[in-house]
From Swiss-Prot:
InterPro entries: ATP-grasp, ATP_grasp_subdomain_1, D-Ala_lig_Van_CS, D_ala_D_ala, Dala_Dala_lig_C, Dala_Dala_lig_N, PreATP-grasp_dom_sf. Belongs to the D-alanine--D-alanine ligase family. Mg(2+) 1 binds at D248, E260. PANTHER family: D-ALANINE--D-ALANINE LIGASE (PTHR23132), D-ALANINE--D-ALANINE LIGASE B (PTHR23132:SF23). One of its GO terms (cellular component) is cytoplasm. It comes from Bacillus anthracis. Coiled coil: none annotated. This is D-alanine--D-alanine ligase. The gene is ddl. Pathway: Cell wall biogenesis; peptidoglycan biosynthesis. GO terms for biological process: cell wall organization; peptidoglycan biosynthetic process; regulation of cell shape. ATP binds at residues 126-181. Its main location: cytoplasm.
Length: 304
């Protein structure tokens, strides 16, 4: 089977994607697969470079990768791919839309407002949220462009910066609590990981710098673990995820708040999902096999 490892892309997370792709290539079973590295530098590259592969193993992140566009292109080309489908990918990439769905389903997520232009900034709404606040690009991952702000001046300055990353911004109530992440594979939960870091926020640098964070598998108290597991699986189902996903949460006063759901979480040595899988006895090469096998089954079930 010719496995195309799709990496690169046109988003701000291109370098993260290349790290993920190289890690996958180094650990795929060379006796089982013919591996075809495919680095995208522009959108049209996919159509030409992927035409002779049997399966696309996606190592992409951010826009044109994690947002459903590549998934839709591959479906048009008749090439099965890894992870969630086009619809789920697009929903999860849009923080505002995904939070609306989670709120509708009764899943706790921090209060927020969405902003598409500076002129629409409503200070009465901000006062209801209360500082500090978290400013995020509506579409993005790896905490790129994310910052905690403590007053209106800092907020306005950060909004100007984030609008350079994205046309929509999410301003979210800051939840100070215990940061955890829940990885799900084929509808089943992997061990929960706690994240403690030297930086105030688990930002881009912290995510890819082992020295700045402590990530460890934890056993939560039974009642809290049940709430966390229930919330993470509810997210996975409500947002129509498939194959694998990672649900990031903040726990405060015994309540798990969902921060976001990642349909193509990082897969480098420093990444959380592989660490969680390893804690469950699934080594990295085996995890890649399982992603390929499960994705092929799911695509078939979808009528692909």
């Amino acid at each position: 089977m010719r496995i195309g490892v799709i990496m690169g892309g046109v988003s701000s997370e291109k370098q993260v994607s290349i790290m993920t792709g190289n890690e996958m290539i180094a650990n795929l079973d060379k006796n089982k697969y013919e591996i075809v590295p495919i680095t995208l530098n522009e959108k049209m590259d996919l159509i030409e470079k992927a035409k002779d592969i049997d399966f696309a193993l996606l190592a992409l992140h951010g826009k044109y990768g994690e947002d459903g566009t590549v998934q839709g292109t591959l479906e048009s080309l008749g090439i099965p791919y890894s992870g969630s489908n086009m619809l789920s990918s697009g929903i999860c990439m849009d923080k505002n839309i995904s939070k609306k769905i989670l709120r509708y389903e009764g899943i706790e997520t921090p209060d927020w407002i969405e902003l598409t232009k500076m002129e629409d900034l409503n200070f009465d709404e901000l006062d209801k949220l209360g500082f500090p606040l978290v400013v995020k690009p509506n579409s993005g991952g790896s905490s790129v462009g994310v910052k905690i702000v403590y007053d209106k001046d800092e907020l306005i300055s950060m909004l100007e910066t984030v609008f350079e990353w994205d046309s929509e911004v999410v301003i979210e109530k800051y939840i100070k609590g215990e940061e955890i992440t829940c990885s799900i594979f084929d509808g089943k939960q992997l061990p929960i990981i706690s994240i403690r870091h030297a930086a105030e926020f688990f930002d881009y640098n912290a995510k890819y710098d082992d020295a700045s964070t402590i990530e460890e598998v934890i056993e939560l108290p039974a009642e809290l673990k049940e709430r966390v597991n229930k919330a993470s699986l509810a997210c996975y189902k409500a947002l129509k995820c498939s194959v694998y996903a990672r649900v990031d949460m903040m726990v405060k006063d015994g309540i798990p708040y969902v921060m976001e759901v990642n349909t193509l979480p990082g897969m480098t040595q420093a990444s959380l999902l592989p660490k969680s899988a390893d804690a469950a006895g699934i080594h990295y090469s085996k995890l890649l096999d399982m992603i390929i096998e499960t994705s092929l089954r799911v695509r078939k079930e979808e009528g692909f």
